[in-house]
Amino acid sequence: MSTSGQPPALKKYMDKQLQINLKANRMIVGTLRGFDQFMNLVVDNTVEVNGNEKNDIGMVVIRGNSVVTVEALEPVVNRIG
């Protein structure tokens, strides 16, 4: 996915481990590798979490309209400029 025209709000999350809550009460944890203007996400090293059950699913593309919340699981630095 191209980096031009990306909303700066998501740039600070690149290469960071995130918890992403999806519609239908689904949750994944993984590393953000890319996104586009529709908030479609490319997530690597992804684990789907369902209660106490964890399922490694590798690299996935998440459709933007499925995303409910995105939470950083590691410190994020706000870069100016």
UniProtKB/Swiss-Prot annotation:
It is found in: Nucleus. The keyword Transport does not apply. Residues 5-76 form the Sm domain. Pfam families: LSM. GO terms for cellular component: catalytic step 2 spliceosome; P granule; precatalytic spliceosome; SMN-Sm protein complex; spliceosomal tri-snRNP complex; U1 snRNP; U12-type spliceosomal complex; U2 snRNP. GO terms for biological process: mRNA splicing, via spliceosome. CDD domains: Sm_G. One of its GO terms (molecular function) is RNA binding. PANTHER family: SMALL NUCLEAR RIBONUCLEOPROTEIN (PTHR10553), SMALL NUCLEAR RIBONUCLEOPROTEIN G (PTHR10553:SF2). Belongs to the snRNP Sm proteins family. Probable common Sm protein, is found in U1 and U2 snRNPs and may be part of the spliceosome. This is Probable small nuclear ribonucleoprotein G. It comes from Medicago sativa.
